[in-house]
Amino acid sequence: MSKKNRPTIGRTLNPSILSGFDSSSASGDRVEQVFKLSTGRQATFIEEVIPPNQVESDTFVDQHNNGRDQASLTPKSLKSIRSTIKHQQFYPAIGVRRATGKIEILDGSRRRASAILENVGLRVLVTDQEISVQEAQNLAKDVQTALQHSIREIGLRLMRMKNDGMSQKDIAAKEGLSQAKVTRALQAASAPEELVALFPVQSELTFSDYKTLCAVGDEMGNKNLEFDQLIQNISPEINDILSIEEMAEDEVKNKILRLITKEASLLTDKGSKDKSVVTELWKFEDKDRFARKRVKGRAFSYEFNRLSKRVTGRTRQDDCGISLERASIKSRSLKLSPFKFHY
């Protein structure tokens, strides 16, 4: 019986970029690896260990090249990595040393952020060779095999291409994506940052969720409302939700989303749901005959039904001292509009 190949467990690198690893090039703890770049050039990467107190200052992430939305790297979203990186780092990050001497992290921004939070060192495969922006972007796409980029992170990258003048059709062709996915990604990227930042684990957000946030942003924008008031109003409740450690991440997301939509509805509909206040001006024996005043907010109107022209043509309202001198009559019911007031 032939043995079946066991499936690979863990992180695998794209074989097209890995030209080989020579074990003889590893002396002691020093590891050397050669990657093939998109231009056909080869670059040698040597492992370095960045001390805990230098990780933040000696490394950086260019989101344009890395592709990971750095604002989404919250302590809660990094929980799984933080719990392991304190003891060991299974895979090194990959970076290039720039002219400033700092290391740009092409792959491993989540490991970098976790190392900073936990105050531990960071292992990085670093090359001192000059790598172009295009080579860096392609290499980052090839080696990133950890957590798949969210539709918003993809959209943020595509948004830069669109802002550079590319059409959505050209973007789709260049990235090997359908035009529908490009549209969805761009819409997710347009969701208000202020609202997205309220979610501790943004990778839980779906396209439908981003559409909801976009709708909230549009509605508040139409009413010239700022997000600050909304955020201030719901922050205590969000803190209460986040204080429940055992709550599942998707449940946390759903609760926060409901808070946002509910508060946005209250803010945008404020004043539009004022109930009409109706005051009876005269009591008639005929139940279908009436004379009344209706007030809704700052607007008011007078309504009459089954009254003669003589009565409605010139009606004096003693309650406010206003003489109504003009009326428009429709069928047997009448609503005074427009008004001519004399005080």
Curated annotation (Swiss-Prot):
SMART domains: ParB. Residues 11-26 have a biased composition (Polar residues). Keywords: DNA-binding, Plasmid, Plasmid partition. GO terms for biological process: plasmid partitioning. It comes from the Bacteria. Residues 1-26, 56-76 are annotated as: Disordered. Residues 169-188 bind DNA. It holds the Pfam family ParBc. Signal peptide: none annotated. InterPro entries: ParB/RepB/Spo0J, ParB/Sulfiredoxin_dom, ParB_fam_C. CDD domains: sopB_N. GO terms for molecular function: DNA binding. Belongs to the ParB family. PANTHER family: PLASMID PARTITION PROTEIN B, PLASMID PARTITIONING CONTROL PROTEIN-RELATED. Control of plasmid partitioning; required to recognize the cis-acting partition sites. This is Plasmid Partition par B protein. The lineage of its organism: Bacteria, Pseudomonadati, Pseudomonadota, Gammaproteobacteria, Enterobacterales. The gene is parB.
